[in-house]
């Protein structure tokens, strides 16, 4: 004798309630919480032959109220030296995409045409994880409400710390890494502010209590816009020194008049603490006008080159003509997990972001550097010799006048300065090193505003020295890099074996982090479903006992429940072994093993002469002739 209709309805109602409850409880995890696997890049259009590098990319929401989302592109290190390191790279502008850095400077790939990628020898991902971030909101692939674009540097830094907190929640196995920030141009304002925000965050009680301190270990800034008070006045001596402007001419007198007006503004107390001074911007515009010959003018990013007037460098570097169409391809957008509904197409520099981000209430980042250095944070500043817009004379004047740790500039003792040491790389003069009290300065000979574009191998050597990478214990072919004729720590710019011991330590760290990653990615739903199943089993058992005398054998065979139901499928997901934490979501064969010889064979771009690129196809507001060229053109404020 079976259940009566009322009892059947009661049991079915109970089952429906439990099923609804389980679905409701799992919904937030399965829909809103993303895992590292959701960001995994399975393939990259145009990728070269050989195994695909391990990458993750996509958007992370930093402000639900304003729909603020920052885009990131992460490359895992190809080899591990003595310990794991992560380098965060930022381009400047403000409003210029860090994909410039990824595809034209320090990333592992460069475009050889609009459709084909090639490996870059000297890329920075050899011994360090690379994290490229389009920030602030509105830059590159990042998006959000235009009404809430950032205006000040502390606001930008706060948003970036929020981004990192959310990023480490998704990728917890990278949180213990030694953390470095690197970038160029207007990132000379970004990076010190972000560093200050991180150090302040690390002192908070909840961070200390939860062991979430980030191991910030150093900053690298190339051709940085850091100190307007020293860098605006450097335009005139630089163009005289390089022979760009001939003194005594009517045009030169006009430039000198604008420089004098700028100096007057700099001496006004209200302007000494500002990042942007319009009257001082006129100096650069006057120089560009001076070089206007026919339809050409000097390239403000590399004075060895010319460009169409009035772009004057905006069409450079030549790779730019391929980068934009590549990043606008639908298959690339899909591969990088970009929200197509929120994007109108990648643009190198967002004019709207630059227009909003004037930092009128922010003090220049140079005022933060002494405190950072005194707290023990190593900082490296490097300059390309042939850059005009953020030239090396301005950077050197800034260092000379900066006071920290009981000294001024590179003083070793009162009146005694650290020597300028001559650097050679593979037998060629490469530049100058100078250092004291946690600050290092490197001048690259014959280099532009984008030094890694010109010399990827030399900048990688600089990076490895700064990070303290030493390949002595893991073997490899060392680079011949000498400072004042002496070799320092053994570095290698190219292929070499991995460190087995370090790899094992990294694997153990990944395994430890695996549960945390799964928990945040929605696998906690397994616990909920399991609990519901146990409760349902108890309900069945009690029902059986209650109705044994009625010949009860099963409940609703039409539901098709058996011992290998959904819980069996969840268990199968966890049977993939102890590989990568995203193993359930992609083919591990793409990642395991050492790179093939084809993968390790890449071409060098050192020493090449680059032709001026074609006219930029950016679709935002272009520059108009006349004043404030840098602030109205496609590169935002021009300091990318």
UniProtKB/Swiss-Prot annotation:
Glycan attachment positions:
118, 438, 446, 498
Q: How does it sit in the membrane?
A: Single-pass type I membrane protein
Gene3D superfamilies hit by this protein:
alpha/beta hydrolase
Q: Which GO terms describe its molecular function?
A: serine-type carboxypeptidase activity
Output compositional bias ranges, type Polar residues. 489-501, 594-606
Report the locations given in the UniProt record.
Golgi apparatus, trans-Golgi network membrane
For whether the record's keyword set contains Protein biosynthesis, the answer is no
Q: Which UniProt keywords apply?
A: Apoptosis, Carboxypeptidase, Glycoprotein, Golgi apparatus, Hydrolase, Membrane, Protease, Signal, Transmembrane, Transmembrane helix
Transmembrane stretches, by residue range? 521-541
Q: Name one GO biological process term.
A: proteolysis
Q: Please, which domain of life does this record's source organism belong to?
A: Eukaryota
Tell me which parts of the chain lie in the Cytoplasmic compartment: 542-640
EC number(s) for this protein?
3.4.16.6
**Which segments sit on the Lumenal face?**
25-520
One GO term of the cellular component aspect?
trans-Golgi network
* Claim: Hydrolase is one of the keywords in the record: yes
Q: What residues sit in the active site?
A: 185, 387, 449
Q: Which reaction does it catalyse?
A: Preferential release of a C-terminal arginine or lysine residue
Describe the family membership recorded for this protein in Swiss-Prot or TrEMBL.
Belongs to the peptidase S10 family.
Record protein name field: Pheromone-processing carboxypeptidase KEX1
Q: Which organism is it from?
A: Paracoccidioides lutzii (strain ATCC MYA-826 / Pb01)
User: Which gene is this protein's source?
Assistant: KEX1
């Amino acid at each position: 004798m079976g259940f009566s209709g009322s009892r059947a309805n009661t049991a079915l109602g109970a089952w429906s309630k439990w099923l609804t409850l389980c679905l409701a409880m799992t919904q937030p995890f399965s829909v809103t919480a993303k895992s590292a696997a959701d960001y995994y890049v399975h393939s990259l259009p145009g990728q070269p032959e050989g195994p695909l590098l391990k990458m993750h990319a996509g958007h992370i929401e930093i402000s639900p109220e304003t729909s603020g989302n920052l885009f990131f592109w992460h490359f895992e290190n190809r080899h591990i030296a003595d310990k794991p390191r992560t380098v965060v790279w930022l381009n400047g502008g403000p409003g210029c995409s860090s994909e410039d850095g990824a595809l034209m400077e320090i990333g592992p790939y460069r475009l050889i045409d609009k459709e084909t990628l090639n490996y870059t020898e000297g890329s920075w991902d050899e011994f360090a994880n690379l994290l490229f971030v389009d920030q602030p909101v509105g830059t590159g692939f990042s998006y959000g409400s235009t009404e809430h674009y950032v205006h000040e540097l502390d606001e930008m830094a706060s948003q970036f710390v929020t981004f990192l907190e959310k990023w480490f929640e998704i990728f917890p196995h990278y949180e213990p890494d030694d953390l470095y920030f690197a970038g160029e141009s207007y990132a000379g304002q970004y990076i010190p502010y972000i560093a200050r925000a991180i150090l302040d965050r690390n002192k908070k009680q909840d961070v200390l209590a939860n062991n979430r301190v980030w191991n910030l270990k150093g900053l690298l800034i190339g051709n940085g816009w850091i100190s307007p008070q020293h860098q605006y006045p450097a335009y005139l001596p630089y163009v005289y020194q390089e022979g760009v402007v001939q003194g005594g001419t009517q045009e030169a007198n006009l430039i000198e008049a604008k420089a004098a007006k700028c100096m007057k503004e700099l001496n006004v107390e209200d302007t000494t603490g500002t990042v942007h001074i319009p009257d001082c911007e006129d100096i650069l515009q006057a120089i560009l006008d001076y070089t206007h010959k026919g339809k050409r003018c000097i390239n403000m990013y590399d004075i060895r080159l010319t460009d169409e007037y009035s772009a004057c460098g905006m069409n450079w570097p030549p790779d730019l003509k391929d980068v934009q169409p590549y990043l606008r391809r639908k298959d690339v957008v899909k591969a990088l997990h970009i929200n197509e509904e929120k994007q109108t197409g990648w643009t190198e520099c967002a004019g709207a972001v630059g227009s909003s981000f004037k930092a009128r209430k922010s003090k220049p980042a140079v005022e933060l550097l002494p405190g950072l250095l005194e707290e023990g944070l190593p900082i490296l500043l490097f300059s390309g010799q042939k850059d005009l817009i953020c030239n090396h004379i301005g950077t050197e004047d800034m260092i000379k006048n900066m006071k920290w740790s009981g000294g001024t500039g590179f003083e070793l003792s009162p009146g005694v300065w650290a020597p300028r040491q001559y650097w050679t790389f593979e037998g060629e003069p490469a530049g100058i090193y100078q250092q004291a009290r946690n600050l290092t300065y490197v001048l690259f000979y014959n280099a532009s505003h984008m030094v890694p574009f010109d010399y990827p191998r030399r900048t990688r050597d600089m990076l490895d020295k700064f990070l303290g990478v030493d390949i002595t214990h893991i073997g490899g072919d060392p680079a011949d890099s000498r400072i004042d004729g002496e070799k320092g720590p053994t570095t290698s710019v190219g292929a070499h074996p991995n460190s087995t011991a370090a790899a094992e330590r990294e694997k153990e760290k990944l395994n430890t982090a695996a549960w945390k990653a799964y928990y945040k990615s929605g696998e906690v739903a397994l616990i909920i479903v399991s609990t519901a199943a146990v409760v349902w089993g108890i309900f069945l058992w009690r029902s059986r006992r209650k109705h044994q005398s009625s010949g009860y054998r099963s409940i609703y065979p039409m539901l098709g429940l058996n011992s290998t139901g959904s819980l069996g499928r969840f268990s199968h997901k966890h049977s993939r072994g102890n590989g990568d934490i995203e193993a359930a979501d992609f083919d591990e064969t793409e990642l395991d093993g050492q790179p093939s010889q084809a993968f390790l064979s890449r071409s060098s771009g050192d020493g090449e002469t680059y032709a001026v690129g074609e006219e930029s196809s950016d679709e935002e507001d272009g520059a108009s002739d006349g004043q404030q060229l840098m602030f109205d053109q496609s590169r935002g404020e021009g300091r990318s």
